[in-house]
Amino acid sequence: MNVIETGIEGLVIIEPKVFGDERGYFFESFNEREFTEKVGPVRFVQDNESKSRYGVVRGLHFQKGEFAQAKLVRVVRGAVLDVAVDLREGSPTYGRWHAEDLTGENHRMMFIPRGFAHGFSVLSEEVVFQYKSDNLYCPSSEGAVAWNDPTLAIDWRIPKSEVILSEKDKHHPFLYEQ
């Protein structure tokens, strides 16, 4: 696997080694030994999968305190713009974000350390999105930043009139209100 730095400490893009032939392809989506060597130790405890359609924006979500989560995210089918925002207090890159095209074709993954908000927009007709997390989901520790925070000014690459949000995601505070 190839690890690509993003300019934000700990937030990396992972390109797996894909083996393909006339039958299709194969790649390791996670190998604990290699991940530990190239990125650092992590113990994933929960896998999640979602299916969404074009225009959906999910996020920007995080968990607080002892329930903070690191995530390894990827797309099985379709395409997203995946976004991680550094919320680590004292970080020299606090409030900075990185966006990456993750697709079922490029097989790229993003490793998002604890202390980041995460979200994505669906750019294809449909997407199947998977992620591993190193801590269990805890509803009472949920936090979020508004997807359209003007300070962050994230271009989700979807016209605002076509954005589809959950009721919950419509009402998150801006970063400065945290």
Residue ranges and their predicted role:
Residues H118:
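Active-site micro-motifs of SAM-dependent methyltransferase domains
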Residues M1-R108, S121-E126, S133-Q178:
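Non-catalytic, conserved peripheral segments adjacent to functional cores
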